[in-house]
C-alpha cells in the first residue's frame, strides 16, 4: 500500500493524471481498445493482417486468462483510507491487473509486428494509470505485465503454425 499511496500522492497536484487514468481504464476495459486498434491496423496494413489478428487474440486471450487467475487468487482490490479509488471496476478482485495484461500483450505484439520498441511504452503508462486509479497494487500490475508479455510471445511463436494446421485441415 505504501507504493500505491506514494504514486497517488505524487499525482494529486496534477488532476489531469486522474482524468488520463480514467480514460485509459475505459479504453482498456475487457481489452476492447486493443481489439479495435488491432482491427484498424489489420485494415491499414493488409500484409500483416494475420499478425494483427494474432495481436487481438493475444490481448483478448491474456485478458481472459487474467480474469481466470483473479478468480483463483481472489485478492481484493486496495482498500485503505489514504487511497483514492477513481474508477469503477467490474469486480472486487485485483491480482493480476487485466488492463496491464492486455496492454502489455498488445504492446509486445505491436513491437514485434512493427520491429519497433516504441509501443512498449504503453505498458508502464497503463500500469501506472491503474495505481493512479487506486484499483491495483504494484504487484498486480507487474504480474499482469509479465503475463501479457508471455502471452504475446507464445501467441506469435505458435499462432502461425496453429493457423496453418487449421487451414490445411479445411482444405482436406
Which residue ranges define each predicted feature?
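Interfacial segments of alpha-helical transmembrane regions
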Residues: 40-64
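Alpha-helical transmembrane spans of integral membrane proteins, capturing the lipid-embedded, hydrophobic core
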Residues: 31, 35, 55, 59-63, ...
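Membrane-embedded catalytic cores of phosphoryl/pyrophosphoryl-handling enzymes
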Residues: 83-172
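N-terminal transmembrane-helix/juxtamembrane module of multi-pass inner/ER membrane proteins
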Residues: 1-33, 66-93
Amino acid at each position: 500500500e505504501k507504493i500505491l499511496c506514494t504514486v497517488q500522492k505524487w499525482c494529486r497536484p496534477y488532476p489531469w493524471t486522474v482524468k488520463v487514468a480514467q480514460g485509459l481504464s475505459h479504453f482498456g476495459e475487457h481489452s476492447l481498445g486493443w481489439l479495435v486498434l488491432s482491427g484498424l491496423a489489420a485494415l491499414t496494413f493488409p500484409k500483416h493482417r494475420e499478425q494483427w489478428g494474432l495481436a487481438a487474440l493475444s490481448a483478448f486471450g491474456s485478458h481472459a486468462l487474467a480474469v481466470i487467475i483473479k478468480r483463483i487468487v481472489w485478492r481484493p482490490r486496495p482498500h485503505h483510507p489514504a487511497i483514492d479509488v477513481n474508477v469503477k471496476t467490474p469486480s472486487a478482485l485485483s491480482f493480476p491487473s487485466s488492463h496491464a495484461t492486455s496492454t502489455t500483450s498488445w504492446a509486445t505484439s505491436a513491437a514485434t509486428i512493427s520491429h519497433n520498441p516504441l509501443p512498449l511504452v504503453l505498458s508502464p503508462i497503463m500500469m501506472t494509470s491503474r495505481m493512479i486509479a487506486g484499483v491495483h497494487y504494484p504487484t498486480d500490475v507487474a504480474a499482469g505485465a509479465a503475463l501479457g508479455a508471455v502471452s504475446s510471445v507464445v501467441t506469435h511463436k505458435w499462432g502461425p503454425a496453429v493457423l496453418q494446421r487449421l487451414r490445411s485441415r479445411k482444405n482436406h
